[in-house]
Structure formats: structure tokens, C-alpha cells
Amino acid sequence: VATVDCSDYPKPACTVEYMPLCGSDNKTYGNKCNFCNAVVDSNGTLTLSHFGKC
């Protein structure tokens, strides 16, 4: 199972680095920072489906 450590998030701004992750909402996030901020916003209901685009 793919996991991402989001313990040091949320962050006020994310870089534009492109390393896509696919969330459990079937949405592609541009990088870990964008994904982890979304995880925090979802109160932990969003999880990582897999690395790469959905």
C-alpha cells in the first residue's frame, strides 16, 4: 500500500514541482504538498490511491 507522510502539513504554499499522486477521490494532485494540503482539508478522509496520475 502506498503511503505519504503528511505530518508536517499543511503548508502555506506549495512548489510547482510536478510529481503526481492519485488520491482516493480519483483526482490527480501535482505533488505531495498539494496532496497533503488536501488531506488536511478533508480531515483525513482523503488517502493516497497510488503514485502517478489517476
Curated annotation (Swiss-Prot):
Kazal-like domain sequence ranges: 4-54
Paired cysteines (S-S): 6-36, 14-33, 22-54
Record has Magnesium as a keyword: no
Main location (coarse class): secreted
GO cellular component terms, A-Z: extracellular region
Keywords noted in UniProt: Disulfide bond, Glycoprotein, Protease inhibitor, Repeat, Secreted, Serine protease inhibitor
Localization annotation: Secreted
Sites where a glycan is attached: 43
Superkingdom in the source lineage: Eukaryota
GO molecular function, one term: serine-type endopeptidase inhibitor activity
Pfam families per record: Kazal_1
Name of the protein: Ovomucoid
